[in-house]
Every structure is written in structure tokens, then in C-alpha cells.
Amino acid sequence: MNPKCSLILLSGGKGERFGANQPKQYLPFQGQPLILHALNSALLIPEINEIIVVCDASYEHIFEGYSVKFAPAGMRRQDSVFSGLHHVTNPWVLVHDGVRPFIYPDEVSELIVIAQQTGAATLVSNVPYTIKQRNPVKTLDRDSLSIVHTPQCIKTEILLEGLELADREQITLVDDTQAAELLGIPVSLVSNKHPQIKITYPEDLTIAHALL
């Protein structure tokens, strides 16, 4: 049986690249704020028994009627995750971006199983494009690369220790499993089985509608 997990749902981003008059995670999508699609899916996952929404207090009303905890958003992603960790009571935690509307229960269950083998795991997909490094220009082997998605599953104490180390060493993390990497803990990669999208630009909403 999989252990119970907490979910940190990150909703503190400003969404400057999107160009809307409000953060993109709160834009209407299929009749409700975008982030609620992820939240409603999370509620269907039996392993999740605690949800912490990290957001600006002015947006807490959007989650009225949901049994969630709130934590204030930080300046950086890792600051927001650290803020959410203060409310986590489970030994395992999932972290998910609020601008990713799709969470699939079967993938999350597999992710939790795999994470227990090493201490950390993330969803990934293959790179379908040719990727070139800049300065100097060099073609990279795309078979050795992966596109990283969320949610990511990490042992709570590992995530906390890694974030504290990053803070001491003044390292900016680009994803949450990097906290495990800093500690020398291997990260397991779990291939996603369903379409994933992160809403970054207006055209991404069109793609998300098509994926429903």
C-alpha cells in the first residue's frame, strides 16, 4: 500500500510572460479557474490526504469550499515550496505547479511507488526535438535528455534538507527534485502516460482545451 502524501500546490506565480491582467493559474478554463482543474483531480487520488495551496492571501477566496491549508508564496519557487513544507504532516510530499491543469491519478500512484525506491521521483517525457547548446553551439543527444513535468514526489525530510542546503549555498533551484540531487540522492524518472502541458503563453490554453 502506498503511503499517505501531502500535496503542495504552487499558485504564487505572477505570469508576466502570459500578458494577462491576472495570474494565469486563475484564468477561466472550462468554466472555472485553471488551478481548480488540478485541485479537483488531486482530490481523486487516494494517497493524498493533505493539500497545501501556496498563494497570495488575496486569492484564497478562490478555494472556498475546499478543505485545504494555505501558505504564503515566496519570491522564488523554492521559497514557496519551503513555505508550504511548514504545513506538511506526512513523510512524503508531492509538489505540483498550479499552471499545469492536468493531474492523472494512475501516474501519481506510480510516481509514489517509484519515489520510495530512491527518495525522489519526477514525471518526464521524451524530447521530440533536436536540442542545441549555446556558447559554444553544440548538438545535444536528445536520447539522453528528458522534459520534466509535475507533480514530483519527494520524501519530506529530503526536500527540506535540500532546500536548506540550497539556501545556505545560494543556489537557485529550477525544480524540486534538484533538492535531492544537491544531497547526492538519485532521482527516479517516471515516463508520463498522458498529455501534459504547462500554461505559459496564451496559445497554451488553446492546446489545453484540445487535450480535454
Curated annotation (Swiss-Prot):
Its EC number is 2.7.7.60. Coiled coil: none annotated. It comes from the Bacteria. Signal peptide: none annotated. The record marks 142, 198 as: Positions MEP for the nucleophilic attack. PROSITE patterns: ISPD. The record marks 17, 24 as: Transition state stabilizer. It catalyses: 2-C-methyl-D-erythritol 4-phosphate + CTP + H(+) = 4-CDP-2-C-methyl-D-erythritol + diphosphate. CDD domains: CDP-ME_synthetase. The keyword Nucleotidyltransferase applies. One of its GO terms (molecular function) is 2-C-methyl-D-erythritol 4-phosphate cytidylyltransferase activity. The keyword Electron transport does not apply. Pathway: Isoprenoid biosynthesis; isopentenyl diphosphate biosynthesis via DXP pathway; isopentenyl diphosphate from 1-deoxy-D-xylulose 5-phosphate: step 2/6. It holds the Pfam family IspD. Keywords: Isoprene biosynthesis, Nucleotidyltransferase, Transferase. GO terms for biological process: isopentenyl diphosphate biosynthetic process, methylerythritol 4-phosphate pathway. Belongs to the IspD/TarI cytidylyltransferase family. IspD subfamily. Catalyzes the formation of 4-diphosphocytidyl-2-C-methyl-D-erythritol from CTP and 2-C-methyl-D-erythritol 4-phosphate (MEP). HAMAP family: IspD. This is 2-C-methyl-D-erythritol 4-phosphate cytidylyltransferase. It comes from Chlamydia felis (strain Fe/C-56) (Chlamydophila felis).
